[in-house]
Amino acid sequence: MIIVGLTGSIGMGKSTAAGMFRELGVPVNDADEVVHMLYSGEAVAPVEAAFPGVAKGGVIDRAELSLRLVAAPERLAELERIVHPLVRAKEQEFVARHRADGAPFVLLDIPLLFETKAEARLDRIVVVTCDPEMQRERVMKRPGMTAEKFAMILKRQVPDSEKRARADYIVDTSDSFDVTRQQIRAIVDDLRAG
């Protein structure tokens, strides 16, 4: 089974691209969705222990946690030491399940693919990109996004140019959904061809 990683800097259209892969029948494991699930399950106790007061009603209040991290960005590594191993375990379960089902390939949607050295466990890498102005416009429309928060996120991410240089496939979402869908269909066809 081919294990494909999907990544892209914030606002590049990675979630949209992942949805298009799903539409074509590709099993997709979304690391962000896994984190959301963990924030109402296994991660609650250890995150609350490290960041007292961020759990409300048995769920991690992501807005509160985000505020704490903007105020103390050096604590992000501490959060990642808690959450990343849990996300990785769920990813391994996903891969094992689809391998047992005989899937020819799966897609792992990993926002911090290069930053977490995930490429070592992947066979192919798809990078989603777009024009930098479009990226900024998309990101600044998000609820609760500030220029400070956007800058903090970008600072933590491998630059888009480096991601593209390390990719096996590039999906440029600067154009229409139809053009993006055509690029993704070509990748899926190539992967199915072996």
Swiss-Prot record:
Family annotation (SUPFAM superfamilies): P-loop containing nucleoside triphosphate hydrolases (SSF52540)
MF term (GO), any: ATP binding
Cellular localisation: Cytoplasm
Primary location recorded for the protein, binned into one broad class: cytoplasm
Record-linked InterPro entries: Depp_CoAkinase (IPR001977), P-loop_NTPase (IPR027417)
Domain of life: Bacteria
Catalytic activity line of the entry: 3'-dephospho-CoA + ATP = ADP + CoA + H(+)
Protein name per the record: Dephospho-CoA kinase
Gene: coaE
